[in-house]
């Protein structure tokens, strides 16, 4: 049985990995073996952090809403409870955006929430 060398398939696969590793530090961007390990690790980080990003943004929105709510004399939980009782369904992303860019509108929502706390 004749010997089969990798040839074009191997070269293409290695070029693909080196291309993915472009911009990495030192030998991680030039040597196939090291680059392959780093690319695999990077893809794992990317997979994990696509899920982490959703949690991080929710935390950020809650922090911003809490800060704005306290400027209006409410805690975050009391604000959310008051809005729920008032039947106002605004998601946290929109509330955080209002808190940052339109303080008057957020203050109006805060007064509505204050009036609807038991």
From Swiss-Prot:
Record GO cellular component, one term: ribonucleoprotein complex
SUPFAM superfamilies named in the record: Ribosomal protein L20
GO terms, biological process: ribosomal large subunit assembly; translation
Keyword check for Methyltransferase: no
Entry-linked Pfam families: Ribosomal_L20 (PF00453)
Matching InterPro entries: Ribosomal_bL20, RIBOSOMAL_L20_CS, Ribosomal_protein_bL20_C
CDD domains listed in its UniProt record: Ribosomal_L20
PROSITE patterns: RIBOSOMAL_L20 (PS00937)
Keywords associated with the record: Ribonucleoprotein, Ribosomal protein, RNA-binding, rRNA-binding
PANTHER family xref list: 39S RIBOSOMAL PROTEIN L20
HAMAP family: Ribosomal_bL20
Function noted in UniProt: Binds directly to 23S ribosomal RNA and is necessary for the in vitro assembly process of the 50S ribosomal subunit. It is not involved in the protein synthesizing functions of that subunit.
NCBIfam families per record: rplT_bact
Family statement: Belongs to the bacterial ribosomal protein bL20 family.
Name of this chain's protein: Large ribosomal subunit protein bL20
Organism expressing this protein natively: Bacillus mycoides (strain KBAB4)
Organism classification: Bacteria, Bacillati, Bacillota, Bacilli, Bacillales
């Amino acid at each position: 049985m004749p010997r089969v060398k990798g040839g074009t398939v191997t070269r293409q696969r290695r070029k693909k990995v080196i291309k993915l590793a472009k911009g990495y530090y030192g030998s991680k961007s030039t040597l196939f073996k090291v680059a392959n390990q780093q690319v695999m690790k990077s893809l794992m980080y990317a997979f994990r952090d696509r899920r982490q990003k959703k949690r991080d943004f929710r935390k950020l929105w809650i922090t911003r809403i809490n800060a704005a709510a306290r400027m209006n004399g409410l805690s975050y939980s009391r604000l959310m409870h008051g809005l729920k009782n008032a039947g106002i369904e605004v998601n946290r992303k929109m509330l955080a955006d209002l808190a940052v860019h339109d303080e008057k509108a957020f203050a109006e929502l805060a007064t509505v929430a204050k009036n609807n706390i038991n």
